[in-house]
């Protein structure tokens, strides 16, 4: 009985150590430790009576991670179908531009939010239609949309960086990015709820299984009764919609859209978050929980860069090194090497015991 319990315990530990999610969490904890060493008040929390929420470096990081959670969730679904969505950063800019411009023109704030979300959904649907029904390559399709999106944002704002901070009645949109729910940043809470809802949709229905099946083999999935074109269309539409939410998070925080910088390079951050979370770029099985942790890690890396005072010129290199280290920590070969070393030590100890 004791041996069976020990064997079950060993199997649990092996599964835990072989999980990408485990190593992602370990990486996050290490980054927190590094930040705490260099910034002693990193984990310090205080109550801000003006905002009605908690304040501190960790809270600021959670606020920033909300936008990454959104685009990483959409990107996870797209990548699991063996696709890619390079347009998410530009969709953020277009959605933000639509919200700020309509608000500046005197439109009701709730209608401005709906228009921004509709624009993101529409771009996602266009991507989905081109990839699924016309059979265009996802990389080329979304690359073109990435370039076109910036142009659309400039057209909407007439090339200006629209500011809606002084517009009356913009409080709901401000709260969307800067408000608090039970002391926790509202945008982070909203993002987590959306991730959970998408996760439930994928795991409590057949949707998740169908997405994975399409990513593994479209022809085989079609033979089992799945309609790959509809699945592909759906995941790109979801990605566009979630990118629009991320765009609102980004622009509402300052009530201003920068048509060049809003969402810039965030498609790369989304892909990195998905990879860190353990979803293969080849498609198939995916982990929304892993991608969520990966998104928070991306925000944590950016916070670490600021805390360590890394030069702006060296920031991309530092970012790349940290991501590579995290990916190496998750590599199956590293796990196998560690397991083999432990096995050899156990055999040596057993041999010594027998010899004695």
UniProtKB/Swiss-Prot annotation:
Pfam families reported in the protein's UniProt record: BPD_transp_2 (PF02653)
Domain of life according to the entry: Bacteria
Coiled-coil annotated spans: none
Keywords, comma-separated and alphabetical: Cell membrane, Membrane, Sugar transport, Transmembrane, Transmembrane helix, Transport
Keyword field contains Transcription: no
Any one GO molecular-function label of the UniProt entry: transmembrane transporter activity
One Gene Ontology cellular component annotation held by this UniProt entry: plasma membrane
Membrane topology classification: Multi-pass membrane protein
InterPro entries, per database record: ABC_transp_permease
Subcellular localization: Cell membrane
Residue ranges crossing the lipid bilayer per the database entry: 25-45, 77-97, 113-133, 180-200, 231-251, 268-290, 308-328
Keyword Transmembrane set for record: yes
Subunit structure: The complex is composed of an ATP-binding protein (FruK), two transmembrane proteins (FruF and FruG) and a solute-binding protein (FruE).
Task of the protein: Part of the high-affinity ABC transporter complex FruEKFG involved in fructose uptake. Can also transport ribose and xylose, with lower affinity. Probably responsible for the translocation of the substrate across the membrane.
PANTHER family, sorted: ABC TRANSPORTER PERMEASE PROTEIN YPHD-RELATED-RELATED (PTHR32196), GALACTOFURANOSE TRANSPORTER PERMEASE PROTEIN YTFT (PTHR32196:SF19)
Family, per entry: Belongs to the binding-protein-dependent transport system permease family.
Designated name of the protein: Fructose import permease protein FruF
Organism: Bifidobacterium longum (strain NCC 2705)
Source taxonomy: Bacteria, Bacillati, Actinomycetota, Actinomycetes, Bifidobacteriales
Gene from which this protein is expressed: fruF
């Amino acid at each position: 009985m004791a041996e069976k319990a020990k064997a079950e315990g060993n199997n649990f530990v092996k599964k835990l150590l072989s999980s990408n999610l485990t190593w992602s969490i370990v990486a996050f904890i290490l980054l927190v430790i590094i930040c705490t060493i260099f910034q002693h008040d990193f984990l310090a929390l205080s109550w801000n009576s003006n905002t009605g929420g908690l304040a501190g470096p960790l809270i600021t990081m959670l606020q920033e991670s909300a936008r990454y959670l959104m685009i990483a969730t959409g990107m996870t679904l797209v990548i699991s179908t063996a696709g890619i969505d390079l347009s998410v950063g530009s969709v953020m800019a277009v959605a933000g531009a639509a919200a700020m411009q309509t608000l500046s023109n005197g439109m009701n704030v709730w209608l401005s939010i709906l228009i921004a979300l509709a624009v993101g959904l529409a771009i996602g649907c266009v991507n989905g239609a081109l990839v699924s029904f016309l059979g265009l390559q996802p990389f080329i399709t979304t690359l073109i949309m990435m370039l076109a999106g910036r142009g659309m944002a400039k057209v909407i704002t007439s090339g200006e960086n629209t500011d809606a901070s002084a517009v009356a009645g913009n409080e709901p949109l401000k709260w969307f990015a800067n408000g608090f729910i039970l002391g926790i940043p509202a945008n982070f809470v909203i993002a987590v709820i959306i991730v959970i809802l998408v996760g439930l949709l994928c795991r409590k229905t057949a949707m998740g299984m169908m997405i994975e099946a399409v990513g593994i083999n479209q022809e085989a999935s079609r033979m089992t009764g799945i309609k790959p074109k509809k699945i592909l269309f759906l995941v790109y539409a979801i990605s566009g919609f979630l990118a629009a939410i991320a765009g609102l998070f980004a622009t509402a925080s300052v009530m201003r859209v920068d048509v060049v910088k809003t969402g810039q390079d965030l498609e790369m951050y989304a892909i990195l978050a998905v990879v860190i979370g353990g979803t293969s770029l080849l498609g198939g099985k995916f982990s929304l929980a892993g991608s969520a942790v990966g998104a928070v890690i991306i925000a944590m890396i950016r916070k670490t860069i600021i805390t360590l005072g890394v030069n702006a010129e060296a920031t991309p290199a530092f970012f790349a090194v940290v991501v590579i280290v995290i990916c190496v920590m998750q590599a199956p070969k590293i796990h196998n090497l560690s397991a083999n070393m432990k096995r050899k030590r156990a055999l040596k100890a057993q041999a010594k015991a027998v010899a004695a």
